[in-house]
Each structure stands twice: as structure tokens, then as C-alpha cells.
Design a protein with these regions (language model features):
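Positively charged, polar, low-complexity stretches
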Residues: 2-85
Length: 85
């Protein structure tokens, strides 16, 4: 049975808590969630570490995203991705 992603849309910008996603599919789930963003729309990712490998993957995408660190550790990193192109 499919599980819903741990996505909170209580705020004006949806948040995805990736800690709750199995590690094996985490990056794929994040890329899928980012694919739903139109130009000008944002999403916040909550990660258990600084996701540098993920940031490199996102930089290589056809779509472009502005990246803003909202919180940097020690237990969680909150990063806002805003689609720019």
C-alpha cells in the first residue's frame, strides 16, 4: 500500500520532512516533490544533515532553484528551494 509523503502544507510554503522517508528512496522523493513546483513556488526540505550531494543533484536539473538555508543544524537543516526557471 502506498504511503503518503511526510508533507506539511500548514504554512504558505509546503515542508517535506525527509527524515521520515526511507534513505533508499529519499533523493527520488525530493526530486519528485520539487517537480511539482512551478516558477516562483517554493518548498522547504527538512533534513538530518547538510544535504550537499542532493544540492549538487538539484543544480544539475533542467529546472533552476534558488537555495536558501533557513536553519543549519545541529539536529536539522531547513532549506528552502524556490523554482526560478
Amino acid at each position: 500500500m502506498p504511503r503518503d509523503l511526510p508533507l506539511s502544507n500548514n504554512a504558505s510554503i509546503p515542508e517535506l520532512d525527509v527524515v521520515q522517508i526511507p534513505h533508499e528512496i529519499r533523493h527520488g522523493a525530493i526530486h519528485g516533490a520539487l517537480s511539482t513546483r512551478d516558477i516562483g513556488q517554493a518548498m522547504i526540505i527538512i533534513a538530518p544533515h547538510n544535504p550537499l550531494p542532493l544540492l549538487r543533484e538539484i543544480a544539475a536539473r533542467e529546472e533552476e532553484f534558488a537555495v536558501e538555508y533557513l536553519n543549519e543544524g545541529p539536529d536539522a537543516w531547513r532549506i528552502q528551494f524556490t523554482r526560478t526557471a
